UniProtKB/Swiss-Prot annotation:
GO terms for biological process: translation. SUPFAM superfamilies: Ribosomal protein S5 domain 2-like. GO terms for cellular component: cytosolic small ribosomal subunit. This is Small ribosomal subunit protein uS9. Pfam families: Ribosomal_S9 (PF00380). Residues 104-132 are annotated as: Disordered. Keywords: Ribonucleoprotein, Ribosomal protein. The gene is rpsI. Signal peptide: none annotated.
Length: 132
């Protein structure tokens, strides 16, 4: 029989991105969709966004982070991963909740793309008006 491995799950969302995050005790490796985080995300700012919850609670080298993320663009995916990591950390240690909540990492950002309306070019952009 296999030894039960301790792991913590968290689901993060942002815009149309959904990230399923798994925290496993380890040395701080972050894997996104079976690729190293450095290969998946090119921009340093996005990598920094992902690491924020772990840095806030000083657990960067305590967990390996395994992520499966779908939908949206790179920025939305990075913020969804941040949300998922924060939720998983709370499952790992409930005492971290106030710290992460204060930083805003546990709050789901409700802003979504506004739908396009008929008669307009975009959600709010009207066609050009001509007096004559």
């Amino acid at each position: 029989m296999a030894v039960a491995k301790v792991q913590y799950f968290g689901t993060g969302r942002r815009k149309t991105s959904v990230a399923r995050v798994r925290l496993v005790p380890g040395n701080g490796k972050i894997v996104v969709n079976n690729k190293a985080m450095d290969d998946y995300f090119g921009l340093e700012t996005l990598k920094a966004i992902i690491k924020q919850p772990l840095q806030t609670v000083e657990m960067e080298d305590k967990f390996d982070v395994l992520v499966n993320v779908r939908g949206g663009g790179h920025s939305g995916q990075a913020e969804a991963i941040r949300h998922g990591i924060a939720r998983a950390l709370v499952k790992a240690d409930g005492e971290l909740r106030p710290v992460l909540k204060k930083e805003g990492y546990l709050t789901r950002d409700p802003r979504m793309k506004e739908r396009k309306k008929y008669g307009l070019r975009k959600a709010r952009r009207a066609p050009q008006f001509s007096k004559r």
